[in-house]
């Protein structure tokens, strides 16, 4: 009787997984890519950096080399203690398109990136804003063109893909990129069905009026992180949000090099998610619950060999469906190599996520440098 109930439970969570992977994530994975027409609208590219001198030297020139007729580059130095501000000042002297915003430590907003970004957004002279981070670089000289091509009169928020550079012979790098792929497949899929809920600040564009319509970051200013996902969670609607996933629109940054650094980064991300709207917390929680439950139920039923052929069939079919859904997404996002490890990476992430939840119950994660 107990095992029969467990089998029904396995079937139920497998069904939930099919709904996610086919009906939601599949809206992105299996959809034909949409291409927008170049708009050539004036754009303010905004980069907020804190102690990123080494990256600034390499990546700001790549931003200035963009094939785009009218844009300014707003460089925000968030009270850096290294050479970041000096480098920004040099770029401002050398190129009239560069505008420097200097942010000094403010007791009311100590170490708060949202305060720095707010000053940068107010300083931007153009209505259309394109964001990336100080440690990111565009995948092509057409990054601005591609991201802005998705703007229309109605679509005033564009979610882009912030990828991580590949590192040969690094298992951790593959795990991080797999997680990034899974996360992107989720928020692109939900955006495609009219339920946008998050984005990444490494690659995000929106019209300035969207920022002021929700009073900027004021409603969550005390939450140290979330300048990207909490803002989108509040401002994005089915009508005003779209995505951009052409390869030329990607940005890249270097992934964490140690498990500890990556784990702490995940702690920050998950601590922000608890401030999402109730429905978004439910949709994310249900997906994770179905992942964990499916794995545990399958292990128990197979270990006791209860209706093992039926159980094995459900497990195999579930992994095939998930593999196809994520595999097509991986093809679009140029992450195919991580799919060879899919079942192992998924199981590892499920238990890492559980570890993060438990750790966050007992201590608060560190935030902006």
Cite the ranges covered by each PLM segment.
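Membrane-embedded multi-pass helical conduit in multi-pass membrane proteins
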Residues: 287-364
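Catalytic donor/gating beta->alpha subdomain of glycosyltransferases that bind UDP-sugars
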Residues: 151, 157-183, 209-212, 216-281
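Cell-envelope/extracellular polymer assembly enzymes that use nucleotide-activated donors
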Residues: 41-44, 72
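Short aromatic/hydrophobic "clamp" motif used to bind/position activated sugar donors
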Residues: 117, 129
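N-terminal membrane-anchoring/stem segments of glycan-assembly enzymes
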Residues: 1-38, 326
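Acidic donor-binding segment of Leloir-type glycosyltransferases
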Residues: 60-107
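Short, well-formed alpha-helical segments that are part of the catalytic scaffolds
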Residues: 24-33, 52-65
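Acidic donor-binding/catalytic loop of UDP-sugar-dependent glycosyltransferases
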Residues: 83, 133-149
């Amino acid at each position: 009787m107990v095992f029969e109930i467990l089998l029904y439970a396995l079937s139920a969570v497998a069904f939930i997984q099919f709904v996610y992977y086919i009906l939601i994530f599949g809206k992105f994975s299996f959809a034909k890519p949409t291409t927008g027409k170049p708009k050539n609208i004036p754009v303010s590219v905004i980069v907020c950096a804190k102690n990123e001198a080494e990256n600034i030297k390499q990546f700001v020139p790549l931003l200035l080399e963009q094939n785009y007729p009218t844009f300014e580059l707003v460089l925000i130095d968030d009270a850096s203690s290294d050479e970041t501000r000096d480098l920004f000042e040099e770029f401002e002297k050398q190129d009239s398109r560069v505008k420097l915003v200097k942010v000094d430590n403010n007791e009311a907003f100590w170490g708060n990136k949202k305060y720095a970004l707010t000053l940068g957004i107010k300083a931007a002279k153009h209505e259309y804003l394109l964001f990336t981070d100080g440690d990111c670089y565009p995948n092509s000289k057409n990054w601005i063109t591609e991201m802005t091509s998705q703007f229309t009169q109605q679509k005033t928020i564009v979610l882009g893909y912030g990828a991580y550079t590949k590192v040969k012979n690094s298992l951790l790098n593959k795990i991080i990129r797999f997680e990034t792929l899974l996360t992107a497949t989720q928020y692109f899929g939900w955006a495609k069905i009219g339920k946008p809920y998050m984005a990444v600040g490494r690659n995000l564009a929106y019209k300035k009026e969207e920022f002021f319509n929700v009073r900027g970051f004021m409603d969550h200013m005390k939450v140290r992180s979330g300048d990207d996902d909490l803002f989108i969670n509040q401002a994005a609607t089915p009508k005003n949000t779209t995505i951009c996933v052409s390869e030329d629109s990607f940005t890249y940054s270097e992934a964490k090099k140690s498990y500890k650094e990556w784990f702490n980064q995940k702690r920050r991300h998950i601590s922000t998610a608890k401030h999402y709207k109730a429905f978004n917390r439910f949709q994310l929680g249900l997906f994770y619950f179905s992942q964990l439950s499916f794995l545990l139920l399958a292990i128990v039923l197979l270990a006791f060999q209860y209706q093992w052929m039926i159980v094995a069939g459900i497990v195999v079919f579930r992994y095939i469906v998930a593999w196809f859904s994520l595999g097509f997404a991986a093809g679009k996002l140029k992450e195919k190599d991580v799919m060879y490890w899919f079942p192992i990476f998924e199981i590892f992430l499920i238990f890492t996520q559980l570890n993060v939840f438990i750790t966050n119950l007992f201590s608060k994660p560190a935030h902006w440098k």
